[in-house]
Regions:
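Beta-propeller blade termini
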Residues: 87-95, 137-146, 188-200
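Blade-edge motifs of beta-propeller repeat domains
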Residues: 60-82, 118-136, 177-191, 195-203, ...
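Acidic, small-residue rich beta-repeat scaffolds with periodic aromatic anchors
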Residues: 18-88, 93-94, 201-298
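Positively charged n-region of N-terminal signal peptides that target proteins for export
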Residues: 1-4, 19
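Acidic/hydrophobic-patterned starts of short beta strands in beta-sheet-rich repeat architectures
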Residues: 97-105, 147-158, 197-201
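Short, solvent-exposed loop/turn segments at conserved positions within beta-propeller repeat blades
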Residues: 107-111, 163-167, 207-209
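C-terminal motif of bacterial Sec signal peptides marking the signal peptidase cleavage site
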Residues: 14-16
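Beta-propeller blade repeat segments, especially FG-GAP/WD-type strand-to-loop junctions
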Residues: 116-122, 165-183, 214-219
Length: 298
């Protein structure tokens, strides 16, 4: 008799667990606004809705969000092993944009995918953004006010390859009125200063040749403020501040500086700018000066 009651109790527990699981795993709905796919330059755009493996990866991620998100910010990662190659996914959930709940999904499979969804009622997720790049690029997403207008924006940063120090940051400004993201703004080796509404950074190119730059958010757009280049006449001991973009500026094209302005000293890539090579010929210096002489601008 005790065995009968024990078996009955086990059945009740199993039924209760299944019932609870059913409550937790509600069927979700995924909607998509009319959005433009954005991608890295060397990656072909694709429609992930026709790829069953990618659909599984994204659906699994959003299903987890639907179960776990209770209104508090949430960040976690997991391995999705039902695909080959195995997918690693990082999920961030919170009231990131306009105090509304959003999900950022960063997943690696055959490509690197970053998607943004707005969480709506009745287990519904509405896609607002889609980015794709090579799986070899470790694209990092972050959310902050890039242009100093008091509204959070989406940033995607990845480390480039090669000898020219190419580390781009893509900025997508969020518009709370339309709940959409802007076209991509690209900055090289950038540091952001939202309180000043300024971006400062180091250009991509040969060390000791490339310049510093500063852009300011004015009237709804990024406006170039100045460039600072090593002064080739003094072998990089001094610098030239100019409004003209381009290596090896002449002194008459700008202001001669005896030192780098303090506002640039904290840039994370400043060391690349300072690597001036005095032991060998600077790249394309002779050609640049000859061309300038021919144009009568020396």
């Amino acid at each position: 008799m005790k065995k009968v009651f024990l078996l009955y109790g086990i059945c009740l527990c199993l039924f209760a667990c299944r019932e609870q699981s059913g409550k937790e795993q509600q069927r979700i709905t995924i909607l998509q606004d009319s959005i433009k796919t954005t991608s890295a330059e060397d990656v072909e755009e694709k429609d992930i809705t026709v790829d069953p493996q990618l659909v599984k990866i994204i659906t699994e991620a959003l299903q987890r969000v639907d179960t776990l998100y209770k209104g508090e910010d949430l960040t976690y990662s997991y391995i999705y092993s039902d695909t080959l190659p195995i997918s690693e996914t990082i999920i961030k959930v919170g009231k990131f944009f306009d105090q509304q709940p959003y999900v950022v999904v960063n997943s690696t499979w055959e490509d690197r995918l970053i998607e943004v969804y707005k969480i709506e009622q009745n287990h519904t997720f509405r896609k607002k953004f889609f980015y794709i790049s090579s799986w070899m690029e470790f694209a990092r997403d972050s959310i902050f006010d890039a242009n100093g207008d008091g509204i959070n924006d989406l940033s995607i940063t990845w480390s480039g390859t090669g000898a020219l120090n190419y580390n781009p940051t893509y900025i997508y400004l969020f518009d709370p009125k339309t709940e959409t993201f802007s076209e991509r703004y690209e900055f090289e080796n950038a540091d952001f200063f939202p309180k000043e509404q300024v971006v400062r950074g180091v250009q991509t190119g040969f060390s000791g040749v490339v310049g510093l730059y500063k852009y300011k958010w004015i009237g709804g757009q990024w406006v170039a403020q100045e460039y600072i280049y090593p002064d080739y006449i003094s072998n990089g001991k001094y610098f030239i501040r100019t409004q003209k973009e381009g290596p090896y500026p002449s002194r008459k094209d700008g202001e001669l500086l005896l030192k780098i302005p303090e506002e640039y000293l904290g840039l994370k890539d400043l060391s690349w700018f300072l690597m001036y090579d005095t032991d060998s010929e600077l790249p394309f210096l002779r050609e640049t000066l000859e061309e300038r002489k021919m144009e009568g601008n020396k």
